[in-house]
Amino acid sequence: MMRKAKVGDVRTIQRLIEASASNGEMLPRSLSEIYDHLRDFYICEVDRSLVGACALHICWEDLAEIRSLAVSQGERQKGIGSKLVRACLREAKRLGIRKVFVLTYRPSFFQKFGFDIVDKAVLPHKIWSDCLKCVKFPDCDEIAMILQL
């Protein structure tokens, strides 16, 4: 079942993100960050267990980011990540967002949705907000991708 996240989901969302972050797949998120951006998150439940999470973060009037896509190890390759991304893209369209971007180590996954690889320089709002806090800044090794809606 796909739904918007609730306050009671925050610790499980953080555990999912931390599991992926510990493998170098994404940046970790603090409990505070997840609470601050809880309304951004969609979650997926299987048999009443939270097995996936993904956020759509609004950056500017015409730009949003899909971030913190995490699926529990045992539930990968079952389409959960794709469902979460589609939910975020539907919301972006509903909100009138014209461009959605992602920073990823898995460009082939996002290319399935029509995302194109771009230079990070086209993402100024992103670079100056989250990237400055990143341990990899300024040597980011993630791939920037954009989808025009």
Ranges and model annotations:
Residues 1, 94-100:
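Short active-site oxyanion
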Residues 1-28, 45, 142-148:
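Short amphipathic alpha-helix that is part of the acyltransferase structural core
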Residues 33-47, 138-141:
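A short helix-loop-beta-strand connector motif used in the catalytic cores of GNAT acetyltransferases and
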Residues 43, 49-58, 62-70:
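Conserved beta-strand in the GNAT
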Residues 69-76, 105-106:
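A short, internal acetyl-CoA/4′-phosphopantetheine-binding micro-motif in the GNAT/acyltransferase core
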Residues 77-90, 102:
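Conserved acetyl-CoA-binding loop-helix of GNAT-fold acetyltransferases
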Residues 98, 104-130:
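Conserved active-site alpha-helix within GNAT-family acetyltransferase domains
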Residues 123-149:
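C-terminal "cap" of GNAT-fold acetyltransferases
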